Amino acid sequence: MPALGRFAVIAAVVAAVPLRFVTTSHLWLDEALSVDIARLPLADIPAALRHDGHPPLYYFLLHVWMSVFGEGDSAVRALSGVCALAALPLAWAAGRRVAGVRGAWWCLAVFALSPFLVRYGTETRMYALVTLLVLAGWLFVRRALERPDPVRLVPIALTSGALLLSHYWAIWFLAATVIVLGWHARRDPAARRVLVAVLAGGVLLLPWLPSMLDQAAHTGTPWAGAVRPTTMVSVSLLDLGGGDFAEATLLGFGLLALFALGVAGRATGEHTVELDVRGVAGLRSEAAVVGLTIAIATAAGYATHTTFASRYVAVIVPLFLLVAAVGGSRLPGRDAPLVALAGVLVLGAVGSGHNVLTDRTQAGVIAEHLRAAARPGDLVVICPDQLGPAIHRVLPADLTELTYPPSPLSPERIDWRDYEKRNAAADPHAFASSVIARATGAHSIWVVSSGSYRTLEGQCEAVLSDLSARYPATVVVAEDGDTYFEHAQLTRFAGTTP
C-alpha cells in the first residue's frame, strides 16, 4: 500500500479509538434492560434471563465490569468499547494471514471505521463481544488447520462455547461452520480435528440448556415476525453502512462489491480484474459460512416464528468485512485501490459520525420536560412497558411510575415470558381506572406512550382515551419516529390539585 494509503489508515485507527467510546445517545430499551439485569446479584441473573431470552455470559461480564467502573452511561458502554477496540489488532492479524501486509492494512482500514462496529462498540449489549470472539475463533481455526495439536484445538472449543453463551445466533453461525468444515474433512484430517473442537464447545452450553429451552418455549421475539432473506440482507447492508441514509447505502453496497471481489476476483493486469464464478482460493470457506448462516437463520426464523434484527449479524460481520477487505487488496494498479480505500474511509467516517450524534431514544427529551415541570408525587404512566427501562433510568426518583401492561418487573425490566398472550388478556380500561383511583391529590398525570408496538395495538390509545375523558390533556412532547429509533409521546393530564 502506498504511503498515502498507510497514512490514511493510521489516521482512521486514531479516530477509531474515541469513536468506540463516545456517543451522545441515552441508553435505549435493550441497553437499559441489560444494565438492570446485570446489576442483580450474580446468582440471580440466570433466573432473570428466563424472563428475557438471552444467554448469560455478557451479563456476568457486565456485572463484574459495573462493580468496578460504575453504572453511568459511559461506564456501562465502555465494556463494549474495549471489545471493539481489541478487535482491531486481530483484524490486522487476520488480513495479514490471508493477504499479506497489503491485506492487513486493508483489513485495519475496513474494521477501524466500520459504522457497524463503531455503533455496537458504543452500545451496552453483547454484539462487540460477539465480533471479538468470532475474529479470535477464526484465527484459532486457521492456526489449527496448519497443525491441529491440542494446544491449538482447545482455544477453538473455548471460543465456540463462549459464543454460544453470548448470543443464540452463534448456533446458526457454528452450524454453518460445521457444515463447511465437514465438507473439507472428507479429505483433510486437520479439518476433522478442528470440527470436533468446534462441536466440543457445545459442552459449555449444556449447563445452560434447560434455561435456553425454557426461553425458546416462552420468550422468543414477540415484537416482530419472521423476515425473508432478501430483507435480512438489505437491512444488514444498511446497518453496515451506519443507518438508513444515502452514504450508508453507498458504503453497504460498496462493501458488498468488495466482498464479491474477495470471493471471486483476481487481478490479471495493471488495470483488469477477472471474476471466477467458482471463487478463487483463499476465502471461499469464509464466504460460504456467511451465506449459510443467513440461510440457516432464515429457515430457523420461519420455523420458530422469530424475527431478525440487523444487530444479530454480528456473528458474521467479521468474516464479511475480512473478505471485503481482501477484495479491496486485490484491486490492481495504484489509483483504483486508493480511490476505493478513500471511499471506504470517508463513507465509514460519515456513518461513524452519525452514530456519535444520533440519540437512539426520545427518553432524554421526555425526562428533561418531566424534570422541569413534574412535581414530587406526580404519576408517570408508561405505555407500553417496553418504554419503561430507558425512561426509568433518566426519571427523577420522586415521581411514581406505573407501567402498562402491569408487571412486577416493570419499569426496570420487561417480562417477555408469554408476552403476546399476556398482552391479549390485558385490560386497558381497568388499568386507566386504577390510574384515576391513584391520582387523587396528584398535581398531574404524565403519560409516556406510543402506539407503534406489536401485540399492544390500540391498548395505549385506549388508556389515553379513558384519561382524556376525565382530565384535560396537553401533548407536551410529540412522538418523533423520524429522528429517534425509540420514540414516544409525553401527554400531561391535569390532576386534582392545582
Positions of predicted regions on the chain:
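Terminal, non-globular segments
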Residues: 2-498
